[in-house]
Amino acid sequence: MATLSKKQQTQKRHKRLRRHLNGTNHRPRLAVFRSNNHIYAQVIDDEAQSTICSASTLDKDLREKLKASGGSCDASMAVGALLAQRALAKGIEQVVFDRGGNLYHGRVKALAKSAREAGLKF
């Protein structure tokens, strides 16, 4: 049997995780996508199939403030804080964390930690 590439392993983990994770309007899903250069996070209501709020390293609000590249832990922390601020402004306090098949380490962990510190509960 052939070995899977890192991308295929991530996709396989994500499919397995999504079987158990589901966001509602009371407790939406915080989905994280990580690329080599950027990180993206969305708060999603799966019942209504809509994105409530989002943040990424490509946002104009963050681009000017970030001294490091979009693929750093510092940038991930800034994205987590911005996303938590936007979610709290819309009245969302609790979310279900969907790491998107990525390992809970590095940039994904930094985003989650800063979102928790900014007031989101998960």
From Swiss-Prot:
Domain of life according to the entry: Bacteria
Molecular-function annotations in GO: 5S rRNA binding; structural constituent of ribosome
Signal peptide: none
Region described as Disordered: 1-27
GO biological process terms on file: translation
Cited SUPFAM superfamilies: Translational machinery components (SSF53137)
Keywords: Ribonucleoprotein, Ribosomal protein, RNA-binding, rRNA-binding
Gene3D superfamilies in the cross-refs: 3.30.420.100
One Pfam family here: Ribosomal_L18p
Family, as annotated: Belongs to the universal ribosomal protein uL18 family.
Self-association state and partner proteins as the record states: Part of the 50S ribosomal subunit; part of the 5S rRNA/L5/L18/L25 subcomplex. Contacts the 5S and 23S rRNAs.
Its job: This is one of the proteins that bind and probably mediate the attachment of the 5S RNA into the large ribosomal subunit, where it forms part of the central protuberance.
Name recorded for this polypeptide: Large ribosomal subunit protein uL18
Organism: Prochlorococcus marinus (strain MIT 9211)
Lineage: Bacteria, Bacillati, Cyanobacteriota, Cyanophyceae, Synechococcales
Gene that encodes it: rplR
